Amino acid sequence: MNGFGLNPVPGQQRLSPDKTVLLLRNGPQQQRQIPLTQIRILIGRHDPPHTQVDLDLSDCETGDPPMVSRCHAVLQWQEGQLTLRDLGSRNGTRVNGEKLESLPDQPYSDIVVLQLGSRIKFGNLEFEVINSHE
């Protein structure tokens, strides 16, 4: 795994599944806090019976057509760290302004480790990684 590395920045507050949430920064559900307690969270839009996601962002969309893909990205807790991978989404995923690029000969991106304060964009939806007590 490369991307932004798996080693936390010295002095950086660690994330934990019981405290960490995604804070939606724009759209009709702005300020919504999404707990990240599951080990693996598939992010996208429900499209039954074909697509079942853990975090359905359909109600958060800022316009039409939707900018979030049916299977957009996956968040996962690995070895005590929160990681993110784009799953080949049409409108992309960005972390702190950097687009997650697909790996050579693969539809998905490399894994990126998120930190407290990381800014994430799924299509045109903006989120921030925060602790739930903030």
What do these predicted ranges mean?
Residues 73-75:
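Buried hydrophobic-core signal for structured, non-transmembrane domains
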Residues 38, 79-80, 89-90:
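A generic structural motif
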Residues 28, 43, 81-88, 95-134:
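C-terminal boundary/linker segments immediately following FHA domains
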Residues 50-52, 90, 95:
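Residue-level signal for pocket-adjacent positions within structured domains
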